[in-house]
Amino acid sequence: MSFQNPSYINAKHRSFLQPKDTQDSQDLRNWVSHSSVDEETAYSSSTLSSSSSKSFPCYDEYDEIKSPDDQKVEYMKTLRTLEEDAFSYTDSVYDFEERSFDEHEPPIPPLHKTGVFSVPLQPTHTVNSNSDDGYENSSKNEYLDFNSEISASPVNEPMTHSQSYTSIDRLNSSSSHYSKDVPLLCGSLTIDCPTPIDLRGMLGPFMQKNPDEASFLRYSAITCQPEDMNNNGLQLRTWSTGRDIQIAVCLTLSDEDLASFAISLSSIMNNLKHLCSRSKSRVWGNESWEKVLVCVVIDGRNTVHQNVLDLLASIGVYQPHIAKGRVNGKRTLSHMYEFTSTINVDEKLNLTTATGDGNVPMQMLLCVKDRRLGTYNSHRWFLNGIASLARPKVCLFVRNGARLGPTSIYHAWKAFDVDSTIGGMCGKTSIDTGKFGFRLLNPFIASQHFDQMIHNNLRLPYDSCMGYISNALNAIYGFRYVALQDSYPNPGPLADYFEQDQYEIPRRGILQSNAFLAQEQLLFWKVITRKDAKWHLQYVPEACATIEAPNSMAGILESKKSEINSSFSLAVYVIVDFFSLWTTRHKFFRFLLLTVQSLVFAIEKLVNFFSMANFFLAFYFVCNATSYSSLNPYGNWARPLFLVFEYILICLIFSQFMLAMGNRPRSCRVLLFISTALFSIIMIYFVFCVFYISLIPLHNSDNSEIVLGNNYFTTLIFSSLLILACYAFVSLICMDPFFIFTCIVQYILLMPTRIYTEQIYALCHLDDASISKDDNQQEFNFDTGITHCSMNDEGYTTISIPKANVLNSVYNSSLKNFSSSNDTSVYHDVQDHCYRKPQSYEDHYQDIRTRYVLVWAVSNLILAIVLIQVFDGMRFINNGYMKYIFWSIVAFTAWKTMGAVTFIATKIISRIANCVKSKLYIFNDP
């Protein structure tokens, strides 16, 4: 009888299939050796039908034996089959379901290492290159390496770039490849491929200590959705080796440049070094790398930079020649590569190895999605697919291009370890200011640095004190995986969060689309509002990361677009979903804090909705007051000067709509620079008018009682000083107040640019969240250069595997291409790979975008016109609306300062308590 589709077998039964040095096998060899039937004839004979139950009880009886020679042939074939099983990978992907073992069934074909025996490298044997499977004695320094198909042969010259990546089909049909039959598991292909010999030589001591892990790269062609990966029996190599994953780090890539990716990958390796150096920890130690899985998810294999793939291939986690576009007629949705490497890349794009560089092994998983579906969908593959297989304790997300601190990953994990009620965390994100702060000379970077520091020192501590982190995107954040999982009968946060994946529902609302682009903020909300749970969030400033801020207005617009849109849409979503807080089990005080935070969050977003009108009204009422004789610093030019600046401001506001709707930022740099310069000049004029109308009347008066009261000074200067005092106070507590002196001027001058240019551009591109992904209902030819495979009647597929010289040639080509790459660019145009939705969908989303922008602009226009008509420009001190705007900002800032101070004080007290506790423990330790 022939083998059917592979069944599942548990690890404890596998040893039964692996022959040892038993008397049966030795007698069989002796018997065959005296026979006229040689081994090659026996091995090349017909497929085994069954075997003798006497010698091998796991086989069925022979149906028919015609001659002694046939017996010898079948016995020889049986012996060869069992020997190959002995060299198979002992932790097969089939080991996920336990069942009873039937000794009368034929042996289960395990997952073979492609083209190489999977026995651990033996120092006393090596492969005879002149025999298919023979052995010969060798020195103790030699290792069992390749089968004859890929045995050591002269290494060819490195292939050209086009040969390595675009001529795979031609290579597969050449004599440099051989065929291999491997089993299919639920329609998905999983194979263990040998790694190049040159790569093994770069792994250093790790190769000798973990030869089996360093000699093979596991490739899986995933044909199912990420939610079905676990049910289909797929297993990660970390699970097969029985490792307990504490942290899974996710790094998503799309069209980012090589330099950004190298910075993040290098910083992750440095964090692994720190974890391995914590020899006194109860969890971490010398083998800490076994508890960390680094996942790189690429959003579309046609959009990623080629030199990024060269880097991944140089590390060893990527091989371009093994990908399969279709498996058994089903389209491959993602290509997954698993490898453990000690090769790292530094920030200067230099490869470092374990020898002499102090690198530690890093377990890497590369998931290359076949289509570009966005970062949101990449997180779905990580959380619903990869994390469900790895089962980590903590899932961390690192923004591409972020340079993590050397202990960031440890402190992120420690926050979850100390407090069991923390469901999510976010770290501290800083702007790279260069050596001695030289980059702060650029006003755009200085303005972003000021805003980011206020975010770190004021907003994040306040949010952490309340329990929900609602602010802008972070460079490092994470979740406790248990808090994300389903708990029957209630679905977990992931079920609701990824239910709105655009791959599943392409016609959802435009605000909902942008809300889900908020990523961690929305998932944070799902965690704290989980039914019958009481998770809260925490800010961990020790988990720090540094990013490079855009140094031009065009770059700022590109980076701020999704942040502004997702922030507003998230506010709408939180307001609508507010009553989900009532289904949680938070304590009353925590529930009260979350309720107050949600209300303040909603009011703040409402004020920001009218920020265009509010700034124009403040400019109009303050500057118009200086054009009259009582407060006139310009003489006869006061009124004309005010009108000139007023008309320039109005024209600039309308011009921003034209620039946003008709151009990309990088194509109109000059116009953006001119508008930014004009906005800054207007801001200088506005600030001068504020100080003049506030201080001149105070200077001319002899009555000191009017310093604070119903006057210009109290409304304008004093309120602004209170806000600045709050900023300085929390920054001083955080031991970082210097940015106020170096960046506040640039921040004030660019304020109208942030209010008008950034907001208008972002909202005019509100529809980008809905049309920049591939359409799941359209078919595109992605299979260029990638082969297919189909399953035969026995549950196997035949694939083409390159020999050793081809592996080395491709690897050396990747090294050469990576070494010669000069990619330091930040911008990369991938419009050729952005497959748009049908025109009807684009029209639908653009229509919604137009309506929303129209409502937003008209609302601000009506508010400005009405208030200008209602209030007299000469009587600003009686303008109740402007007082409300200024003092509401003061109230928001003061409230957040109280929360931030509470958070910082709590952390200080906690540190002191832990220090005292540790001292007492040492003192009382006998």
From Swiss-Prot:
How is this protein annotated for GO cellular component?
cell division site; cell periphery; cell septum; division septum; membrane
Q: Which residues cross the membrane?
A: 564-584, 599-619, 641-661, 671-691, 721-741, 853-873, 885-905
Q: Where in the cell is it found?
A: Membrane
Which keywords accompany this UniProt record?
Cell cycle, Cell division, Cell wall biogenesis/degradation, Membrane, Septation, Transmembrane, Transmembrane helix
Q: Does the keyword Disulfide bond apply?
A: no
Q: Which GO terms describe its molecular function?
A: chitin synthase activity
Q: Low complexity compositional bias: what residue ranges?
A: 44-55
Q: What GO biological process terms does the UniProt entry carry, in alphabetical order? A: cell wall organization; chitin biosynthetic process; mitotic division septum assembly
Q: Which domain of life is it from?
A: Eukaryota
Q: Which InterPro entries match?
A: Chitin_synth, Chitin_synth_fun, Chitin_synth_N
Give the range the annotation lists for the signal sequence. none
Q: How does it sit in the membrane?
A: Multi-pass membrane protein
Q: Residues annotated as region Disordered?
A: 1-56
Briefly state the protein's biological role: Plays a role in septum formation. Has no chitin synthase activity.
Q: Which family does it belong to?
A: Belongs to the chitin synthase family.
User: Which PANTHER family is this protein grouped with?
Assistant: CHITIN SYNTHASE, CHITIN SYNTHASE 2
Indicate what this protein is called per its UniProt record: Chitin synthase-like protein 2
The scientific name of the source species is: Schizosaccharomyces pombe (strain 972 / ATCC 24843)
Name the gene behind this protein.
chs2
